[in-house]
């Protein structure tokens, strides 16, 4: 068709003469006009004309289109396009589109190009739609690190469109301390050369970069196989590298040989191939050798340049860039807690006032000593602000009608109890008169319950005024929370009602000010099962595509899958973590920020780094959502009972954990379940109820121990369970919570700091050192105890268990004394899979489905939904004792 057409040298001057004084219009003009300008330069003609790009113009006039391809615009504007990608038809369609756009411009009172340029200045949305290039940004100084984080944040928050982007103008704004490299084949310079841009344009591009990059031929070999590039063979690729080197020499820019590393070793490409296939890439099998080359390998890759030039770009210039960089680390090493003015005195005043209100003036010596010791440690180590923040959050929730449950070891702090942060009183069991402040801490009656719970003690009348004494204390050492020297990093975790959690999060902004709090970011990685699925499906799809069987043994699939495990998959947010930025600091000195999972529809902003990476810098508040406070709020509304007034020594409630008598039913009525604990938080699962049956709890403190056992990892199964069955330990002597270890070892005469260190090591699953074992044996610690310590993988603190059992007990109390209110609250809040037709049509029909689901469970064919339904069915069966059937809706 063009065989006999004039050569470019003949026709181009005529074409440019024809265009003289006119405005050129093109669709994706940057690409098309680059060829004209390039060819014109080669024959000595300078092209200086105004160009309008219908892509950019359409983005300005019609910003809501999903793309701006020529065929998309023709359909949108009802323009005829008969043979797309045929030059004449495309040009005609572009002209028709432009004519319609001219009318749209006049409608907007834009009569000329000058006004168009003024009105069409780039905003964030327009920038998002621009063609993008890769570049390398290195931080060469501390200021550069901060500027880099500013750019990363902007790329995720302002300019994200399918992936993060940043305009060059923003790079220039924050250029201090940054070194900019021209990157790979997807970089602006390489693309300009491949697309035949003019020398002037290439010179402009080069001027932006601090150094230029060339890469091994194998990295870009794919260009030879594609028709999109005017690259015919490897020599063309070498010529492109030679041109980049020549540009570096011409413009005094160092040229560096880089690898564009995506994996470490050559054989690791299989992992990238599988991950890309799992994400739907059609060309996943065409992997370039993007591994980390050695210096010798890189010198060999560039030997076509001669040994001197190869050494210069591989070794000398690489080190030149390195020497431009200071020694910096990605995260700041210093701790920057938030500041609340007068927090030290504020905490001391709140705690002392509450202690005087509760225990009277003067305070009992044991109370005063504990409170003073804690406050001195908390304040001297700079943790008072953490307490005040928690106090403000809890008090606000309480004022709004919701209890807050404590998590972790904060309940071991008496100061936290006095500040109203936790309900757990960690003092040793004691009697206290609420009327005249009479107290007993060291009587023989009290000493019998050392290590237990005050609520387990028998009732007693005040010998001074005749009022019934309160029974208090869980006997938890403060050192579990802060260490003996205040050298343990404390963490205050709180369980707010799931209905109230978002309000608690918002209240942190009230405390610290707008822009000072961020959601704690997380990084989601490829899990083991997901990786296995990727590998399995990869070979399955490959087999179907190639029409031949590809058989891989399970062990081979697992081996390959192991290389895909823990690869970053997505980002997210901690369910309750709030990171607090001190006033006066900039978040970018610690971390970039972004939307979780790059969801631009949400207003939530998270830390870009996983919060663990910066938890030594910034305070993270754990403001979690939990169902217990929500359920207790509903029970309070239904019954009028103040949950704080519910006694923790009810024999009827305690009996739920031993049999079904308090409910007036038999195990036969509820499918053979021997206990009344169904539907009680922490104790209603088959696993927990079997623990109750095995341990036979008699006291509230036994329930705390059982909760510790059930929450831990390798604490009960294959450990305490075995020891109790063998008669080596009881529920009272087995290791149930981390505190047990430290207290027991100190009682054995081991130095307190050593006991604390052993506890910390064991509770994290790190076992015991030989030296620690020797110390324990020297102090007559039995072998079974040492064996138990070495089996433990993770242990919860006693304060955590106590707080959870207190919440569970209140629910259990309502199950015994206010059953209909209990079931109403349970099915409103805790039921996950309630099915009216299966569960509310009579006991016979219900039990038919229960038997059916239990049979499926034994055969391993039950689905997750059916598993959830079965849990709810068992509570409904429980409820049928109190009502013949649910009222028909």
Per-region residue spans from a language model:
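Noncatalytic, beta-rich nucleic-acid-contacting surfaces in large DNA/RNA-processing enzymes
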Residues: 282-283, 338, 342-889
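Metal-dependent phosphoesterase signature
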Residues: 1-12
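Phosphodiester-processing cores and adjacent nucleic acid-binding clamps
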Residues: 3-5, 17-19, 27-30, 34-569, ...
């Amino acid at each position: 068709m063009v065989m006999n057409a004039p050569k470019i040298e003949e026709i181009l001057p005529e074409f440019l003469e024809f265009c003289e004084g006119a405005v050129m219009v093109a669709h994706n003009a940057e690409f098309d006009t680059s060829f004209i300008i390039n060819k014109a330069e080669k024959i000595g003609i300078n092209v200086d004309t105004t160009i309008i790009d219908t892509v950019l113009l359409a983005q300005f006039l019609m910003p809501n289109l999903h793309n701006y391809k020529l065929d998309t615009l023709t359909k949108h504007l009802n323009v005829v396009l008969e043979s797309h990608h045929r030059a004449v038809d495309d040009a005609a369609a572009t002209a028709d589109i432009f004519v319609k756009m001219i009318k749209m411009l006049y409608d907007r009172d834009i009569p000329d190009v000058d006004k168009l340029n003024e009105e069409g200045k780039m905003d964030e949305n327009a920038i998002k739609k621009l063609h993008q290039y890769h570049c390398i940004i290195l931080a060469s100084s501390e200021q550069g690190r901060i500027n880099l984080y500013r750019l990363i944040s902007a790329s995720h928050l302002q300019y994200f469109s399918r992936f993060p982007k940043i305009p060059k103008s923003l790079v220039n704004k924050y250029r201090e301390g940054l070194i900019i490299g021209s990157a790979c084949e997807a970089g602006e310079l390489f693309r300009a050369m491949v697309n035949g841009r003019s020398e002037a344009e290439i010179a402009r591009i080069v001027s932006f970069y601090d150094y230029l990059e060339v890469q091994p031929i194998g990295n870009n070999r794919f260009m030879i196989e594609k028709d999109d590039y005017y690259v015919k063979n490897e020599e063309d690729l070498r010529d492109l590298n030679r041109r980049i080197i020549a540009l570096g020499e011409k413009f005094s820019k160092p040229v560096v040989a880089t690898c564009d590393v995506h994996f470490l070793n050559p054989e690791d490409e299989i992992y990238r191939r599988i991950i890309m296939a799992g994400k739907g890439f059609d060309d996943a099998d065409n992997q370039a050798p993007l591994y980390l080359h050695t210096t010798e390998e890189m010198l060999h890759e560039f030997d076509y340049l001669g040994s001197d030039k190869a050494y210069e770009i591989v070794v000398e210039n690489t080190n030149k860039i390195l020497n431009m960089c200071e020694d910096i680390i990605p995260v700041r090493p210093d701790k920057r807690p938030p500041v609340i003015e007068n927090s030290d005195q504020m905490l001391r005043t709140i705690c002392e006032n509450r202690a005087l209100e509760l225990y009277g003036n003067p305070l009992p010596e044991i109370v005063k000593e504990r409170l003073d010791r804690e406050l001195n440690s908390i304040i001297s180590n700079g943790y008072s602000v953490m307490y005040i923040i928690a106090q403000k959050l809890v008090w606000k929730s309480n004022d709004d009608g919701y209890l807050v449950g404590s998590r972790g070891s904060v309940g071991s702090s008496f100061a936290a109890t006095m500040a109203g942060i936790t309900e757990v009183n960690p003092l040793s069991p004691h009697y206290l008169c609420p009327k005249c402040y009479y107290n007993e801490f060291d009587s023989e009656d009290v000493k019998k319950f050392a290590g237990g719970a005050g609520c387990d003690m028998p009732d007693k009348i005040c010998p001074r005024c005749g009022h019934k004494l309160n029974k208090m204390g869980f006997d938890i050492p403060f050192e579990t929370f802060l260490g003996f020297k205040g050298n343990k990093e404390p963490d205050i975790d709180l369980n707010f009602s799931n209905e109230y959690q978002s309000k608690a999060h918002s209240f942190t902004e009230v405390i610290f000010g707008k822009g000072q709090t961020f959601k704690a970011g997380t990084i989601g990685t490829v899990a083991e099962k997901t990786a296995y699925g990727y590998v399995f499906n990869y070979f399955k799809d490959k087999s179907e595509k190639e029409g031949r069987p590809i058989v891989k043994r399970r062990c081979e699939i697992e081996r390959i899958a192991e290389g895909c495990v823990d690869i970053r998959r997505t980002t997210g947010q901690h369910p309750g973590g709030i990171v607090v930025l001190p006033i006066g600091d900039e978040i970018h000195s610690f971390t970039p920020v972004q939307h979780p999972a790059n969801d631009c529809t949400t207003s939530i902003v998270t830390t870009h780094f996983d919060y663990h990476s910066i938890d030594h810098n910034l305070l993270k508040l754990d403001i979690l959502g939990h169902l217990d406070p929500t359920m207790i709020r509903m029970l309070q509304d239904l019954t009028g009972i103040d949950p704080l007034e519910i006694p923790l020594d009810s024999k009827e409630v305690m009996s739920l954990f031993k049999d079904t008598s308090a409910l007036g039913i038999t195990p036969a009525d509820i499918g053979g379940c021997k206990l009344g604990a169904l539907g009680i938080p922490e104790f209603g699962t088959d696993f927990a109820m079997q623990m109750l049956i095995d341990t036979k709890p008699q006291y509230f403190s036994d329930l705390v121990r059982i909760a510790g056992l059930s929450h831990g990892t390798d604490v009960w199964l294959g450990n305490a369970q075995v020891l109790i069955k063998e008669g080596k330990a009881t529920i009272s002597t087995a290791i149930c919570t981390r505190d047990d270890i430290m207290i027991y070892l100190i009682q054995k005469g081991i130095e307190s700091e050593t006991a604390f260190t052993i506890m910390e090591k064991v509770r994290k699953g790190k076992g015991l050192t030989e030296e620690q074992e020797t110390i324990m044996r020297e102090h007559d610690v039995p072998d079974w105890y040492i064996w138990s310590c070495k089996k433990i993988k993770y242990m919860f603190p006693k304060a955590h268990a106590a707080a959870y059992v207190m919440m569970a007990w209140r629910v259990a109390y309502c199950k015994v004394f206010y059953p209909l209110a209990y079931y109403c609250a349970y099915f409103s809040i805790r039921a996950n899979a309630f099915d009216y037709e299966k569960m509310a049509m009579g006991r016979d029909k219900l039990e038919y489905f229960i038997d059916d689901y239990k049979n499926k469970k034994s055969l391993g064919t039950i689905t997750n939904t059916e598993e959830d339904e079965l849990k709810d069915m068992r509570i409904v069966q429980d409820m049928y004792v109190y009502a013949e059937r649910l009222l028909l809706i």
